[in-house]
């Protein structure tokens, strides 16, 4: 069985501040115990530099604990007249290691199709970033028992456009749309069922990738349900939304992941 390091990725969405970055790192420096889990902060682009400064300032205090920086989105284009967009190279220059691709809010609010998501996935890898690909079904799709069908389609488009080894350097986040920001989380059993399907699906393309890829759960994860979710054999941590803005609760999730 592969030893997959758990990850807790905090997606601030359009929230946060430089002060929040400072507050988080102050607690990281005294509370994070080891490198058994990886912590990723994904602030709005304007605060990437604030997080980077805190990473540099607290490097010694973190004592080897794995705290990384990620972005919430990138352009599929390398450069050009794309007002308001940020390229993969720009994110790499800013110190990012990860970038969230295809979040349900981007797909729903900004019309990002699966083809666009696949292009952004490729752009991230081209510039040395690890994409965190979000997949998930809507409430009606789950009720119609189409969960696996929807997720398979979202995975297959990425493979078709980027090749069978596309997920060799990637992370997947399963975020059921009916749980994102609603306060209603999937049960541990529901999460495990879908994560196992994703792993099996990718194993059909590459057994190595299927066994080793990290699959996060995202959707109303809190300190009260994280332990049961993270204990599932195919759940490798969480993509965290609202709770990532509360330094105490987010640190609690990190501690739970480290002991999972």
From Swiss-Prot:
Annotated active site: 103, 175
This enzyme's EC code(s): 5.3.1.1
Name of a matching Pfam family: TIM
GO cellular component: cytosol
Broad class of the protein's primary localization: cytoplasm
InterPro entries registered for this protein in UniProt: Aldolase_TIM, TIM_sf, TrioseP_Isoase_bac/euk, Triosephosphate_isomerase, Triosephosphate_isomerase_AS
Compartments reported by the entry: Cytoplasm
Quaternary structure (record): Homodimer.
NCBIfam families given in the database record: tim (TIGR00419)
Protein name: Triosephosphate isomerase
